[in-house]
Amino acid sequence: MKIEKTEKKETCCDVIPAEVIKLLEEQLVNEMHNMRVYQTFAVYFNNIGLNSLYSYYKTRAYEEFHHYSNICEFLDNNLVKYNFIEIPECKIDIKNSIDPFELTVQLELDTTDAFYEIYELAEKNHDYITIQWLMKPNGLIEEQSEEMRTSYKALEIANMNLDWISKADAILKLL
C-alpha cells in the first residue's frame, strides 16, 4: 500500500491573516500621518520661538516613524506582501499653543485603539506571531502605552497657569 502524504506548504505570509495585514497597512498610513502632524507642530513651535517644544515634537515625530519602520520590518520579516496606502494631506489649523497637545492626545488614543484592534483581530484568528510581536517587551503596545502617558502629562502641563518657557522645558523633560 502506497500512502501519499500531501502537505500544505505554508509560507509566513499565509500565517498572518489577510484581515490583520489590512489593519497593519492602515496603521502604516496612520503612523506616517501622525509623524507629519507632529512635524507640523514642531514647525509651529519653532516659529513662535519655543525651541523646547520644537525638540519635543521632532522627537515625537521620530517615534511615529519608528513605529512605521517597526511595522514594515515585521511585515518584511514574515514575507508578507503588503501595499502602501496613500497618506492623506496633513491640514492642521492651530489656533493656540494648547491645540497641538489636545490633538496629540486624540491621535494617541486613536493609535492605541488601532493597535488593540489589531491585537484583538490577531487573537480571534489565532495569529500568535502578530500577538507576540505586539506584546513583546518594548513592543508597539508597550511603547504606545508610554506615549499615551506622556501625551496626557504634556497636556496637563500645557494647561497649567505658567509661562510657556517653563511649560515647554517641563514638557521636554517628559521624554
Regions found by a protein language model. Give the residues of each.
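Iron-associated oxidoreductase/ferritin-like identity signal
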Residues: M1-L175
